[in-house]
């Protein structure tokens, strides 16, 4: 995978340990501290970028908002999800993510999300834009995704196995055939019942 990323022009940064013992699940957030990065998105390593993600990110860039957030599954109903946000350089005020995370829990399940909800969200909630397919009425500055969901129910943040097959339980059990709230559909596309 590393060689594929390099071939595509990705910059690879190896992390073998950090001062303050920042938990590994927080490492992906450290891009927010990098002064050489102007804009970034954080995604889980087991998800894949897709067109829906791309068009949402493009809409965020045009908006001028500091932080971008995605909620594209019924289980994404949180202020922020660990692998579905992004930002611009300088949008998260000092101290750095590394310093804040060093004082937070380590690699326990959900600690990354609790960190974002408790520590980062209060700092950025007024200068963020969220694309939200299910809970757009619960959080500030939320809006529908700019594209209709694919017929295969693919979603931003969807988990894939190492053979590139999607984890179908996330789709079949929670999304397939379940209409979303009309408030979370674009005004001119109320027919996007699985938006």
For the regions a language model picked out, list residue spans one by one.
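Active-site-proximal specificity loops/subdomain of glycosyltransferases
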Residues: 1-39, 48
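Structured helix-beta-strand junction loops
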Residues: 8, 63-64, 122-126
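Conserved donor-nucleotide/metal-binding helix-loop-beta segment in metal-dependent transferases, i.e.
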Residues: 20, 48-80
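Conserved glycosyltransferase catalytic-site signature
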Residues: 25, 29, 54, 112-114
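Active-site acidic catalytic loop and adjacent metal/ATP-binding pocket
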Residues: 45
């Amino acid at each position: 995978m590393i060689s594929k990323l390099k071939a595509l022009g990705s910059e690879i940064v190896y992390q073998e340990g950090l001062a303050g013992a920042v938990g590994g699940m927080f490492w992906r957030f450290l891009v927010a501290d990098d002064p050489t990065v102007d804009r970034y998105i954080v995604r889980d390593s087991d998800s894949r970028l897709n067109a829906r993600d791309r068009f949402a990110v493009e809409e965020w860039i045009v908006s001028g908002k500091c932080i971008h957030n995605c909620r594209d599954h019924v289980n994404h109903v949180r202020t922020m999800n660990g692998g579905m946000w992004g930002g611009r350089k300088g949008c998260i005020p000092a101290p750095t993510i590394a310093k804040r995370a060093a004082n937070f829990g380590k690699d326990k399940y959900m600690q990354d999300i609790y960190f974002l909800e408790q520590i980062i969200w209060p700092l950025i909630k007024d200068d963020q834009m969220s694309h939200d397919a299910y809970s757009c009425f619960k959080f500030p500055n939320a809006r529908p995704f700019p594209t209709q969901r694919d017929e295969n129910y693919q979603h931003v943040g969807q988990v894939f196995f190492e053979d590139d097959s999607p984890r179908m339980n996330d789709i079949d059990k929670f999304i397939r055939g379940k209409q979303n709230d009309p408030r979370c559909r674009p005004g001119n596309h109320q027919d996007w019942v699985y938006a």
